Amino acid sequence: MLVKADMTKDIAQVMAEVGRKAKAAAAPLSIATSEQKNKALNAAADAILEARADILEANRLDLANAEKNGMAASFVDRLTLNEARIDAIAEGIRAIATLPDPVGEVIAEWDRPNGLHIERVRTPLGVIGVIYESRPNVTADAGALCLKAGNAVILRGGSDSAHSSAAIHKALEAANLPADAIQIVPVTDRAAVGEMLKGLGGAIDVIVPRGGKSLVARVQSEARVPVFAHLEGICHLYIDKSADLDMARRIALDAKMRRTGICGAAETLLVDRAVASTHLAPILGDLAAGGCEIRGSAEVLALYPAAKPATEEDWSTEYLDAIISVALVDGISGAIDHINRYSSHHTEAIVAEDAQTVARFFNEIDSAILLHNASTQFADGGEFGMGAEIGIATGKMHARGPVGVEQLTSFKYRVRGSGQVRG
């Protein structure tokens, strides 16, 4: 629930109060039944739709401020809500409600020779802190995912999306969710983020940052609690010599241009040198016709003069815009070398028909999501059947890839005996 902050208190006191309330809410949430949680989630979806007009009006205020501040088109796209996106938010919440309840799931069980029966069982993490920037939908997605997994959540959205996030949160309040299950940080001062990163006196169990490189870097540098890091999406698409050209053209256009401002958008296109003379121009022509700026290596410029020269910086840049860097590589080995050198380990895709080539791509590239003959824009929790996601974790500890309800749980061991002692 929204905290009514007494601004005579300092920020540390305000945030400590938020933490105490979240910790108190986490205990009953951890033992809530599936029926109780699903009923609350469906009520939240209804409330979002009923508050549609208020949410859109709040979003217009945020968009006006973004235009006034000269924000990039990709930023504005992430910030924008419309009828279809609000419908998608509500549908995402309902999808989360239909997912199996992870809490209490027996992940593994076995018997010991001494007769002990051991079970590894999923449990909630406790209190999740989510720090995000310009995506107001995260308010609903994160709240719903955490609730489904039996966690309380503290949301700290960016000032750019403050009106939209507050309107969505107000709608969630109207759904009579468990008290303090979903709180939004009541102050805009960045010092509040610092307090969250300290853990709010042990209240926060994990932090999930969702935003730009500077935000994630700050969280990783300052956090005193575990972090599910969502780094930038420097995503690659590799077109192998065995690729079907028509398929490659469709996938390349979608991977880059469907939505340029999301983390799963392709930022670098790699083409097998063996088919550059036949495949490069058609693929780049499609991208250019769609409004994409092409930045190519010297070899690419020779075959496609309309491209602009790529710099070394381009290979490690997340554009979040209608720009793509393009290079030729010596087959799958060259693609693997380039990707492992420049990737942020988010998402990579290959278009190929040769099974051995695909196997090497899957085995030798260490990124959270690898796709074969499919667009990088499928790197999304909703597309994975998770209902929604808090982010794409690019680290290797605990959560990796889309962070959904299962990733928002831990586990404990239940050991059943019949009087055994070690002696």
Swiss-Prot record:
The residues forming the signal peptide are none
Cite the Pfam families for this sequence: Aldedh
What are the subcellular locations of this protein?
Cytoplasm
Q: State a single Gene Ontology molecular function.
A: glutamate-5-semialdehyde dehydrogenase activity
Q: Its Enzyme Commission number?
A: 1.2.1.41
Biological or metabolic pathway of the protein: Amino-acid biosynthesis; L-proline biosynthesis; L-glutamate 5-semialdehyde from L-glutamate: step 2/2
Q: Which GO terms describe its biological process?
A: L-proline biosynthetic process
Assigned protein family: Belongs to the gamma-glutamyl phosphate reductase family.
Annotated NCBIfam families:
PRK00197.1 (NF001221), proA (TIGR00407)
Which HAMAP family does this entry report, sorted A to Z? Answer: ProA
Q: What is this protein called?
A: Gamma-glutamyl phosphate reductase
Please tell me the species this chain comes from.
Answer: Brucella suis (strain ATCC 23445 / NCTC 10510)
Gene symbol of the encoding locus: proA
